[in-house]
Amino acid sequence: MIDWITSQGQGVLGAYWTPLWILIRAVIIVVPLLLCVAYLILWERKLIGWMHVRIGPNRVGPLGLLQPIADVLKLLLKEVMMPTQVSRGMYLIAPLMVLMPAVAIWAVIPFQAEVVMADVNAGLLYVMAISSVGVYGVILAGWASNSKYAFIGAMRAAAQMVSYEIAMGFALVTVLMVAGSLNLSAIVNGQNTGYFADMGINILSWNWLPLLPMFGVYFISGVAETNRHPFDVVEGESEIVAGHMIEYSGMGFALFFLAEYINMIIISTMTALMFLGGWAPPFESVVTNAIPGFFWLLIKVFLLLSVFIWIRASFPRYRYDQIMRLGWKVFIPLTVAWLIIVAIWIKSPWNIWH
């Protein structure tokens, strides 16, 4: 589909098509992301409200649906306060260094068969590489802010992200081993073949079942990577107020939160693609096959995002040493052990993948 649009555009506009197409793709990615983040925040506040037996936002617009618009306007109109002793250049560029990798990842994420901005063969490697870059913006913000609280938060973020990146990487390596491809579309298609898929029970052929420990490790590590509760010691309110964001206000502060929620959506989308069959329906039938694959992916991502929120509402914050212990002493040994088990499984007569 993308190739057809490109060929048609080049035929009509010639050399002008390339910069125009880059701009169009950027808009196609960014605008829906902004809307998704705005209403994800509203859904989070609503869902936590219901879990706390209260209503949640319900004043701005019908049923509170305009609350995200009001929040955006509030942040846009706030004065940007810059402390006098900050490293100005690094202070200003840090929020962008956190946000840009989160946006760039969407270039290779497929939304259904043949609907992807760039269908590259090394898509999984690209995601793993780009997702590691955001921590530099966090470290830069902590260093440039000239604040002890911000610096402590940045150091915590660096240690936490490095710790859980390893476990996430091993979890994705197991998916790579069973799929035999780094292409995200090929990984999704590989989950919808086999004995159960032939019977029309796709849900039992997805990677979540044979790779169940990796599924859990990847998603929980994703919660830690995004600094979400109960892993939010990076911005622990009771200790360091807001961590690396403490000296930011207005849109600088908003960009950090925007990146956090975009990363939540990325983790949920990657979990759905790697372990939950992507855009495939759970069961084959006339009704489920009539629903476009994009909507199945959307449903899975929405449910995983709701789990993010449920975790926030249900668990207390871990201590910093507990978070490090979980990453290094539990997740990494577990993923290495399961990696070896899967390698032996693939080479055994009971191989269910190839």
UniProtKB/Swiss-Prot annotation:
GO terms for biological process: aerobic respiration. GO terms for molecular function: NADH dehydrogenase activity; oxidoreductase activity, acting on NAD(P)H, quinone or similar compound as acceptor; quinone binding. It is found in: Cell inner membrane. Keywords: Cell inner membrane, Cell membrane, Membrane, NAD, Quinone, Translocase, Transmembrane, Transmembrane helix, Ubiquinone. It is a multi-pass membrane protein. InterPro entries: NADH_UbQ_OxRdtase_su1/FPO, NADH_UbQ_OxRdtase_su1_CS. The chain crosses the membrane at residues 22-42, 91-111, 124-144, 168-188, 203-223, 255-275, 291-311, 326-346. It catalyses: a quinone + NADH + 5 H(+)(in) = a quinol + NAD(+) + 4 H(+)(out). Its EC number is 7.1.1.-. Coiled coil: none annotated. The keyword Cell inner membrane applies. Pfam families: NADHdh (PF00146). Its main location: membrane. One of its GO terms (cellular component) is plasma membrane. Belongs to the complex I subunit 1 family. NDH-1 shuttles electrons from NADH, via FMN and iron-sulfur (Fe-S) centers, to quinones in the respiratory chain. The immediate electron acceptor for the enzyme in this species is believed to be ubiquinone. Couples the redox reaction to proton translocation (for every two electrons transferred, four hydrogen ions are translocated across the cytoplasmic membrane), and thus conserves the redox energy in a proton gradient. This subunit may bind ubiquinone. NDH-1 is composed of 14 different subunits. Subunits NuoA, H, J, K, L, M, N constitute the membrane sector of the complex. This is NADH-quinone oxidoreductase subunit H. It comes from Cupriavidus taiwanensis (strain DSM 17343 / BCRC 17206 / CCUG 44338 / CIP 107171 / LMG 19424 / R1) (Ralstonia taiwanensis (strain LMG 19424)).
